[in-house]
Amino acid sequence: MWNNLKTTILLAAMTGGLLVIGEYWAGQRGMMFALVLAAVMNLGSYFFSDKIALKMSGAKPIARQENPRLYQIVERLAAKAGIPVPKIYYIPTDSPNAFATGRNPSHASVAVTGGILDICDDEEIEGVLAHELGHVKNRDILISAVVATLAGAITLIARMVYWGELFGGFGGSRSNNRRGGGMFSALAMMIVAPLAAMLIQLAISRSREYEADATGARITGNPQGLARALDKIDKWSKRIPMQASPSMAHMYICQPLTTGGVFSSLFSTHPPMRKRIERLIGREQF
């Protein structure tokens, strides 16, 4: 319920932001265009954000005969979690990672990379998949997928505004009267938009990871399995960085973008792996 409310607030805020931008650059005509754009984006985010996320990650559906072991694990965990069995996808990369997406538990998908299947044993794979099913059970997946879509859209709109202003604005009188200020505002938006998208990701992601870890550990009854998997994923993902869209970084079980530097932990979409492992090791009794 709370996640559905947060999703509604997020979509409403995006609509309001687009209306303000449209009115500033092209008056009433800009507001009408922004309203149509917001309606398309809101509907698209709700119904197609999971498909967009799977497409952006390069995930492919995997049939039961291709990996019966994976299907058995997912089906067993879904039964324990009390949720429908999600669709299963495979991401062809050696970097170990995984994510879940969808509108609700009845329309959910989980995706795992080849790296996860290569480096993890069955208990560790169970831990990873239980974590992802934890996101499904906790209903994190809709807001997570919507944020991924909107983060990309925010950056795209900022670029459109910038290039539109650079090559003569949007044709409105306001744009013509404010050419200097409009160009400065468009440039500022180009800089601020990615930061705003990142802050949105940070606002909804860190606590969710702790909660999904705890839920996954309860599903399996084996927090050590997930703790070992996280340790392996952390080490191997540094050796084999994953090529992932920044707008999707918050969706993965492990931060796919290696930033490094003094601000890396501050602006990471995930809590430090060490802290996640320590919390799990302390959760051995259920």
Describe the role of every protein-language-model region.
Residues 1-10, 28, 43-184, 195-286:
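Polar-ligand-bearing catalytic/cofactor-coordination segments
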Residues 30-40:
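Hydrophobic core segments of alpha-helical transmembrane domains in multi-pass membrane proteins
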Residues 186, 190-191:
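Hydrophobic alpha-helical transmembrane segments of integral membrane proteins
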